[in-house]
Swiss-Prot record:
A Gene Ontology BP annotation from the UniProt entry: L-histidine biosynthetic process
Name of the protein described by the UniProt record: Bifunctional protein FolD
Taxon lineage: Bacteria, Bacillati, Bacillota, Clostridia, Eubacteriales
Sequence similarity: Belongs to the tetrahydrofolate dehydrogenase/cyclohydrolase family.
Gene (UniProt): folD
GO cellular component: cytosol
Enzyme nomenclature, EC number: 1.5.1.5, 3.5.4.9
Keywords: Amino-acid biosynthesis, Histidine biosynthesis, Hydrolase, Methionine biosynthesis, Multifunctional enzyme, NADP, One-carbon metabolism, Oxidoreductase, Purine biosynthesis
Length: 277
């Protein structure tokens, strides 16, 4: 039995939906445009922005790559965001993080128009999300839910344990599982008896950024294991879960790479295709 939950496979289907949608738009004389802002030259952010651009172009979405010098003032960055907010040709705005230390990330992200905030970064966007109002979904948590649903894994009534409480993954994912009527426990560095808590999980999600931290002793027989973590070990990308050790015990498991991460950028681009929600 194949136990692999492949984000790559699910992404192929979603890319097809996006491509069909943008082709229909262009046939009617319309188009979609995303503006992506990079401040400085962080290697990871440069790579990610280039990857975003390539995927967007392949899917028929216009992509504006904005590179700003690391020394740019906070005021000038704010002016650039306000300019994009007012530009009706721009359907979505992405601001790559982290920002240089002299720029207040909270102030700047809060300037992004919530109707264009593809990454759900601003406090208005986050407020809409937690109140259940219409907004762009946080992409990594959305990737987890999308992957489970694509494989027809029942969520309602299930016991879900999330290890990690970050604002980017753990907390919004907690809310999304609640919305699916799961019973959810969030674990963190102060959680006592972590193994015992994890062993209760029908669905175990790990998002802590510690390579190979979770082994089979944390997993109940037949659990679904979702690995959100990515770390570099000896030049290779590795997840938070010791894949080889956990594989036999899990009923289904995501690989790293090839799992959740394979979906995130695709879903980010899908965010701008509002009619596909």
């Amino acid at each position: 039995m194949d136990k692999i939950l492949s984000g790559k496979t699910v992404a192929i289907d979603i890319k097809g939906q996006i491509k069909s949608y943008t082709e229909e738009l262009k046939a009617s004389g319309k188009s979609l445009k995303i503006s992506s802002i990079l401040v400085g030259d962080d290697g990871g952010s440069v790579y990610y922005q280039n990857f975003q651009e390539k995927l967007a172009n392949n899917l028929g979405i216009d992509f504006e790559k904005i590179k700003l010098d690391e020394s740019i003032s906070e005021e000038n960055l704010k002016l650039k965001i306000e300019e994009l907010n007012k530009d009706d040709s721009v359907n979505g705005i992405m601001l790559l993080l982290p920002l240089p230390k002299h720029i207040d990330e909270r102030v700047v992200t809060n300037l992004i128009d919530a109707d264009k905030d593809l990454d759900c970064l601003s406090e208005v966007s986050v407020g809409r999300f937690y109140k259940g109002e219409k907004c762009f979904m946080p992409c990594t948590p959305n990737s987890v839910i999308t992957l489970l649903k694509a494989y027809n894994i029942e969520i309602e009534g299930k016991e879900v344990v999330i290890i990690g409480r970050s604002n980017i993954v753990g907390k919004p994912l907690f809310q999304m599982f609640l919305n699916e009527n799961a019973t959810v426990t969030v674990c963190h560095s102060k959680t006592k008896n972590l193994k015992e808590v994890c062993k209760r999980a029908d669905i175990l999600v790990v998002a802590i950024g510690r390579a190979n931290f979770i082994d089979s002793s944390y997993v109940r027989e037949g659990a679904v294991v979702i690995d959100v973590g990515t770390s570099e070990v000896n030049g290779k990308i590795t997840g938070d879960v010791n894949f080889d050790d956990v594989y036999e015990k899990a009923s289904l498991i995501t690989p790293v790479p090839g799992g959740v991460g394979s979906l995130t950028t695709t879903l980010l681009l899908k965010n701008v295709c509002k009619e596909l929600d």
